[in-house]
Amino acid sequence: MKHIFVLSQFIAIALLSYFGNVLAFDWYVMLQLVVVALGIWAVRSVGENNWSVYPTPNEGSSISATGAYKYVRHPMYTALILFFLPVVLRADGFFSWTIYGVLILTLIVKIIFEERQLIKKHTEYTHFKKVTKKRLIPFVW
């Protein structure tokens, strides 16, 4: 199951990258640079040994509630979604919006699956969910 999530995610990213203009030099690139910084902050906040593209916890992993994880439980996914938003806005076609929707839907289902795995492995994740209430967007979801 975990391979299906990752495969779907990377196919959507590859299609958006192939058919869209990932790094055009327009004002959208500023958003992308800020989002790259968010992604780096998220990786640094969680620690090098705690993150993976797979929605299953690594051996020896722990729960991070600092840095970006103070605001949302999945800031790397937030960064990924926001990074590709300008790509879709530049392309502005039905196909790119559909693939973007598939990417977001894949990440939402992946988050739900991942959180179930985290609760099984880390009992403190239930407390973390109470402290950091939102999954992707502060104050929203």
Language-model features, listed with the residues they occupy:
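Membrane-anchoring alpha-helices and their flanking helix-loop junctions
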Residues: 1-65, 82-141
